[in-house]
Amino acid sequence: MARYIGPKAKLSRREGTDLFLKSARRSLDSKCKLDSKPGQHGRTSGARTSDYGNQLREKQKVKRMYGILERQFRRYFAEADRRKGNTGETLLKLLEARLDNVVYRMGFGSTRAEGRQLVSHKAFTVNGIVVNIASYQVKPGDVIAVREKSKKQVRIVEALSLAEQSGMPSWVSVDAKKMEGTYKAAPDRSEIANDVNESLIVELYSR
């Protein structure tokens, strides 16, 4: 399955919520009607979605938020299911611990997609070692730093400036001058997307 490269706003409209696929400087505006599905006239039917349809839609929404393809998403779910605790919450925490997401959360990338691209271009080190794998699982205490040769990249500088203004999650700490951050701990569920109902995903894979 190929990665989606079409209009980002269309995906958010399809899910009826902002998936934060666009940077803050190009955020969705009133022209993007999230309550209207993609297409010339949007939703034309008031038909009730089945339970399975709702479960499938929730999975698609989370996949699109994190830029994950189906096979990889199934692996994350299997890993979450093996671990102790709430499977749905564990799934979200595994996704939040991806290096491309942590880069985004620390403000070094304006979107997760940009974070993924920067990671693949070897713009960061983890504990002093260059890592170019977007799915790398960051652990508490890990230090993510922008490499010296990448510190002048305009998109990193601009993204960090915007992040400083809007604020960063409590589970990361960032030294903007050094352009490095520490992943302090896995986020609490309350610090992850509130419009995600992970229990629907668990129900889907438990069918």
Curated annotation (Swiss-Prot):
Molecular function via GO: rRNA binding; structural constituent of ribosome
A Pfam family it matches: Ribosomal_S4
SMART domains linked: Ribosomal_S4, S4
Superkingdom classification of source: Bacteria
Domain S4 RNA-binding: start-end pairs: 97-157
SUPFAM superfamilies assigned: Alpha-L RNA-binding motif (SSF55174)
CDD domains, per the entry: S4
Disordered, as annotated region: 31-56
GO CC, alphabetical: small ribosomal subunit
Keywords: Ribonucleoprotein, Ribosomal protein, RNA-binding, rRNA-binding
Biased composition (Polar residues): 42-53
One BP term from GO: ribosomal small subunit biogenesis
Family to which this protein belongs: Belongs to the universal ribosomal protein uS4 family.
Function: One of the primary rRNA binding proteins, it binds directly to 16S rRNA where it nucleates assembly of the body of the 30S subunit.
Subunit structure: Part of the 30S ribosomal subunit. Contacts protein S5. The interaction surface between S4 and S5 is involved in control of translational fidelity.
Protein name: Small ribosomal subunit protein uS4
The species this protein was found in: Janthinobacterium sp. (strain Marseille) (Minibacterium massiliensis)
Primary gene name: rpsD
